[in-house]
Amino acid sequence: MEETDLLPVPDPASAIVVQEPLGKGPGHWAGGPSAALGPDGAIYLGYRFRRPFGEGRGFANVVARSEDGERFETLVTLDRKEFGCESLERPALVAVPGGGWRIYVSCATPGTYHWRVDVLEASDPTSFDPRSARTVLPGDEHTGVKDPVILWHEGLWHMWLCCHPLDEPDHTDRMWTRYGTSVDGIDWDLHDTALGPTPGQWDARGARVSHVVVADDGWRAYYDGRATAEDNAEELTGVAVGTSPGHLVARPGPVAASPWGSGSLRYLSGVEFPDGGMRLYYETSLRDGAHDLRTEYVPPSR
């Protein structure tokens, strides 16, 4: 494990595999993690299973629990058919201050490139019921929205939302991150772009925030970036910083990649512990083109 001057840099070769893909080869993924520390001290993890196009795509979101952050027990599995969607992407799992849980589910509208975000609420993560789903981020005819990163801080919900333009059907892979706020985590006010692509750089095609850390000197974020349309779904990880949550500036990167396959290391999520330690979760490409889900622990800085 290395550390930049901002955030820990993952080392997939020494990390522990949390979940293997359910098939071999390109398009078979276990990943898109969203980690949360529960009031019981356990780690709760939402993630996504995917098959290739034509075989189900993102067919399930899973919620699991672990005492040690490495060995997980599945609590509930959410099937894409229960949401009437073509595919599920990375969920956002959050513990609600004062009690209760939410999972924000990214749903692909059948036959289109459009995405929306639904939310499920429950007293505990075993009780999520798709029949109670309601759409909180519908997107529109111009923009598909998915993969929210949601954080409660100082009495306000903060969100970093991945946006895809739909104006050019052959270029819907382009992406940027928009910032939003909410007093209740349900009704959102969307603000300006928090992080966009960097022309001519490794993230010129897209920039998607995957995890945000509040630091003494501002806000720090991991994000996924890609240079070309051909790199879609095989992103690398970079770091961005800002004095405001709604304006993040990319640092030179990428900072992390897989040593196997396409080199993709993406959707990094983390849990920060009270003692300053941190546990990372991320999706990593493998030699055969599949992706697995890995974790590693980062001890407190000295």
Predicted features and spans:
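Beta-rich carbohydrate-recognition and catalytic domains
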Residues: 1-86, 94-147, 151-205, 213-263, ...
